[in-house]
Design a protein with these regions (language model features):
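Membrane-proximal lumenal/periplasmic loop motifs of glycosylation machinery
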Residues: 11-24, 28, 35-56, 63-64, ...
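Loop-to-helix entry region of an early transmembrane alpha helix in multi-pass inner-membrane enzymes
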Residues: 45-60, 64-85, 104, 116, ...
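Transmembrane-helix signature of polytopic, membrane-embedded enzymes
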Residues: 70, 87-109, 127-128, 148-149, ...
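Transmembrane-helix motifs of polytopic, lipid-linked glycan transferases
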Residues: 74-95, 128, 132-136, 325-329
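Short helix- or helix-capping micro-motifs
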Residues: 103-111, 115, 135, 164-168
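Short acidic/glycine- and proline-prone juxtamembrane loop motifs at membrane-interface regions
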Residues: 112, 118-125
């Protein structure tokens, strides 16, 4: 896929990236990191535009293979391979090794996952870090509260906070998982609430310690407490404005050019207030937008114009639709397995809700599909392998 993508772009001199805006920003920030320059792009400087997780990964790849696009794509392809392995680990931890292998195989043959893995976009990197954080949380949930497990509980609590923070550094929308994890951890620990609260504190401590460098750096450049980025406001307005359709269209940002008279922090506040004001005054349009965004999020094939070729639509749909059917069946046969359902369905529902407000597309669903494929693997296993085992047992008898 990396070879195909690079050859297609090489034949179109006017194009540098498959998806221009975000990819160009990530690439330029990575170059700034590699050269030891200020973490900012554009004029006037945008110092808190993106979380540094993915640019750091790109910069690391550049330091090994150089700044050529094809070499970096090959490194990102290896990250896609790593995603298969982490899905295997999570599936094995949640159910068994067979489920892990089936889920990893589904990920390996997914055209969308393979295709996005070689683009200069953060989806695959976030998927890997998100899956690792989910794996650590599952490991933590299985640690007993006895005295002999105190060290193990402490270790996995801190690791859970650290892994959540690493995923957050790639995609800031993962931030809300921390309070959700704390609530679930405490309320699921019947008879051990105090110990669970201690673990929750350690998780928050691990997360906070990881966040300190970014928050401190942002305070230095903005004189404000900024735990995420200063792009949330324009992103929110992109999804809630008079011309909004559910698709991203940031043309208003260039047309209005508010950075000419505002700081980056003031600009973020300005668009946040405008988006909230518009939502309050136009609930009907907001409700219709939610429907459009929900449709874009769950659409089996990509929404973007450049991906509307028949073979692309077919390649993505022929995998996604059956996988979703197996996931529904897997959810039914696992309806009493609350941890499994939480880890596999939780992320895809979580991002679906977030993108009822922000703009929506397959891109934002894709990272959550990785854990969902574990539920699909459960459905496949119960539909085929379980029945095969039962038939062999009957024949044996």
């Amino acid at each position: 896929v990396a070879v195909y993508v690079q050859r297609q772009l090489d034949q179109q001199p006017e194009r540098t990236y498959v998806i221009e805006g975000d990819a160009d920003g990530y690439w330029k920030l990575a170059q700034q990191i590699l050269r030891g320059e200020e973490y900012s792009i554009y004029t006037p400087p945008r110092r808190v535009l993106r979380m540094p997780g993915f640019p750091v990964l790109l910069a690391g790849a550049m330091s090994v293979v150089g700044e050529g696009h094809f070499g970096v794509r090959l490194v990102l392809a290896l990250l896609g391979v790593l995603a298969c392995y982490v899905v295997y680990l999570l599936g094995k931890e949640l159910v068994n090794e067979s489920i892990g292998l089936i889920a990893a195989a589904l990920v390996a043959v997914s055209p969308a996952m393979a295709g996005f893995s070689v683009l200069f976009l953060s989806e695959t990197a976030f998927a890997v870090t998100m899956l690792i954080s989910l794996w650590v949380l599952v490991k933590l949930s299985k640690v007993e509260y006895g005295a002999c497990d105190q060290f193990k509980g402490t270790l996995f609590s801190i690791l859970a906070g650290i892994s959540l923070a690493i995923a957050f550094y790639v995609r800031p929308s993962w931030l809300l998982i921390l309070p959700l994890a704390v609530v679930i951890l405490v309320f699921s620990a019947k008879g051990n609430r105090i110990a669970a609260m201690q673990r929750a504190f350690l998780m928050c401590l691990g997360f906070s310690m990881m966040l300190v460098p970014w928050v401190y750096r942002n305070y230095q450049v903005t004189n404000h407490f900024v735990p995420t980025t200063l792009w949330a406001g324009p992103s929110l307005y992109d999804g809630l404005n008079p011309q909004a359709t559910g698709d991203s269209n940031m043309i208003f940002f260039d047309q209005e050019n508010v950075l000419k008279t505002m700081s980056e922090y003031e600009m973020n506040q300005h668009y946040t207030k405008r988006a909230i004001k518009y939502a309050r005054e136009n609930p009907g349009h907001v409700f219709r937008l939610m429907g459009a965004k929900l449709l874009r999020y769950w659409k089996p094939w990509p929404n973007a114009v450049q991906f509307q070729k028949f073979w692309m639509i077919f390649a993505v749909s022929v995998i996604f639709i059956p996988v979703m059917c197996f996931a529904i069946y897997g959810a039914w046969v696992s309806r009493d397995q609350y941890l499994l359902l939480l880890i596999t369905l939780g992320p895809v529902i979580y991002f679906s809700l977030i993108h009822l407000i922000f703009v929506s597309s397959l891109r934002y669903r894709l990272p959550a599909e990785y854990s969902l494929y574990i539920l699909s693997a459960v459905g496949i296993y119960h539909m085929f392998f379980n029945r095969l085992t039962e038939k062999r047992s009957i024949l044996g008898q």
